[in-house]
Design a protein with these regions (language model features):
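Gly/Ser-rich catalytic/binding loops embedded in alpha/beta enzyme cores
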Residues: 2-175, 284, 289, 294, ...
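Short, well-ordered beta-strand elements within core beta-sheets of diverse protein domains
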Residues: 10-16, 95-99, 214-221, 341-346, ...
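Glycine-rich, small-residue loops and helix-cap segments
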Residues: 17, 73, 166-167, 346-470
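Acyltransferase
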Residues: 21-26, 56-59, 102, 271-297, ...
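Short helix-loop capping/hinge segments that flank enzyme active sites or metal/cofactor-binding pockets
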Residues: 71-94, 253-262, 311-366, 378, ...
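Glycine/threonine-rich flexible loop motifs
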Residues: 88-98, 272-273, 385-393
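Short glycine/serine-rich loop segments
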Residues: 104-105, 109-230, 414-415, 419-426, ...
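A short helix-breaking turn/cap at a secondary-structure junction
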Residues: 191-277, 459-469
Length: 470
């Protein structure tokens, strides 16, 4: 019965006492038992007895006080890198299997007030790269083809949501880690403005102006479902001095909106055949719904973006790796080792130059948003690739020069801190899904979600469910 219900419908039925929280939890636990062995999306499980006892207790509390938060009693599985007290957090890396946190992450503390934690979702090793595989938990399968990648680094979360193992999920996004797996799963994935969701943060030493380049994000099958999670976890928290509250934004009619279609950023980005066609087919249909679409030619130089981005990313990751006190760096996966070595070589002057380039493009992007409500780019440069690959090496016949060049399409939003949602755009002739990034100005997170809601009303991509999960 619950299989075809939206999050809104489930919440309404719980509040009206038409269904019990325990029934909802049992529904999702049954689906996890049935489908998760094929997917490997949820990789760490809270004891089922504890979960069912908590569900019963929440039902009892609801009966005595029904003024509860919307996500009260709903199941959630956090990305493996978030700490749950007394549960392993290892980032998919064997050396850290004995890392047992003594306290919860801010996000987990927030969940525990209302939701029911059922486990953790899989990730790329150290959350580096757009392919969810690691040497502790293995690879997560794509919900539309189990031989393909689920994307990453939050691929476990996206696969779990797409398979309806959980109603929605968090992820993190530095370089596409919510947008990429959402595109690979035919769902919606949000990279908010960094700071919109409070986090446990560390500061880069001696670099107070170092920008926020990573953020917690969200996944859901529909934007409306996503709003319930995002509205709960967003907002200022006194424990995170960089967090802030978002302002509400009035909805605009589609006919009043204008999108700048960046395509390949002045022929600078490479895409697997078929990706541009899917995006442009959707854009034509949006035009027929009176949305204004313009092909965009800009002064943005992708190589400058790339230079700035890989400096800031590698420096951030290098400083992060130092926190783990790893004994054998040669055991790092190749992608993480690349970042460690790159970060180790970066000087303060390199970072300052990268920040200078970033600031230059912040000014340019503000000028663009005077003319456009949104910018648009494909959500990936490749369709879901073989799961047994360590890393893609080609885009069509073009050799990739670093492990992450196939992720370059994410750098515009990531470098400039722009809220971005990946929306589904359809499937190729092999039945593999793809998405498109809708990018708004800083702190206009609600604007991209509002647009995505209108978009889903037109196209109803959530009706396409993976046959392998039925």
């Amino acid at each position: 019965m619950l299989e075809n219900f939206s999050v809104h419908q489930i919440i309404s039925k719980i509040k009206d006492r038409e269904i019990k929280i325990a029934e909802v939890i049992n529904f999702y636990l049954d689906r996890i038992k049935k489908f998760n062995p094929k997917l490997n999306a949820i990789i760490s499980h809270i004891d089922e007895t504890k979960i069912t006892e908590e569900a019963k207790l929440k039902d009892e509390n609801f009966n005595s006080d029904n003024d509860k938060d919307d996500i009260y009693g709903l199941p959630i599985a956090v990305k493996e890198l978030f700490d749950i007290k007394n549960e392993v957090t290892c980032y998919g890396y064997k050396e850290l299997l004995k890392n047992i946190p003594k306290q919860n992450s801010l996000l987990v503390d927030n969940y525990k007030k209302n939701a029911i934690l059922i486990g953790k979702t899989n990730l790329s090793e150290f959350a580096v790269g757009c392919h969810t595989t690691n040497r502790v938990y293995g690879a997560t399968s794509n919900v539309y083809d189990h031989s393909k990648s689920a994307g990453g680094s939050s691929g476990g979360a996206a696969a779990a949501v797409a398979a309806n193992l959980i109603p929605f999920a968090d992820g993190t996004d530095m370089m596409g880690s919510c947008r990429n797996p959402a595109a690979f799963a035919n769902i919606y994935g949000l990279r908010p403005t960094p700071g919109a969701i409070a986090e446990d943060r560390f500061e880069i030493k001696n670099l107070k102006d170092f920008p926020l380049i990573s953020t917690t994000g969200c996944f859901a099958r529909t934007p409306n479902d996503m709003e319930f999670l995002f509205n709960y976890i967003k907002g200022r928290n006194v424990k995170d001095k960089l967090s802030f509250d978002l302002k509400d934004i009035n909805n605009k009619k589609l006919s009043d909106l204008k999108i700048g279609w960046c395509i390949d950023l002045n022929e600078q980005y490479k895409y697997e055949d078929g990706i541009i066609d899917l995006c442009e087919n959707i854009l034509k249909k949006l035009q027929s719904n009176n949305l204004n679409i313009e092909d965009l030619k800009t002064e943005i130089n992708s190589e400058e973006l790339w230079y700035s981005w890989i400096i800031l990313r590698a420096k951030f990751l290098y400083e992060n790796f130092l926190l783990y006190n790893l004994k054998n760096l040669n055991e790092l996966p190749s992608q993480a080792y690349w970042e460690y070595e790159k970060g180790k070589s970066i000087k303060t002057k390199d970072v300052l130059k990268a920040i200078e380039i970033r600031n230059k493009y912040m000014d340019k992007i503000q000028n663009l948003f005077k003319h456009y409500d949104f910018l648009a780019l494909p959500s990936a440069q490749l369709f879901p690739f073989e799961k047994n690959l360590n890393n893609p090496e080609f885009i069509n016949d073009n050799k990739i020069d670093t492990y992450h060049r196939y992720m370059e399409v994410y750098t515009l939003s990531s470098l400039l801190g722009l809220p971005t949602i990946s929306i589904p755009v359809g499937f190729n002739n092999k039945g593999l899904p793809m998405g498109m990034q809708i990018i708004a100005n800083v702190k206009e997170d609600n604007k991209v979600i509002n647009f995505a809601n209108s978009y889903e009303e037109i196209f109803n991509f959530s009706k396409f469910k993976p046959k392998l999960m039925q």
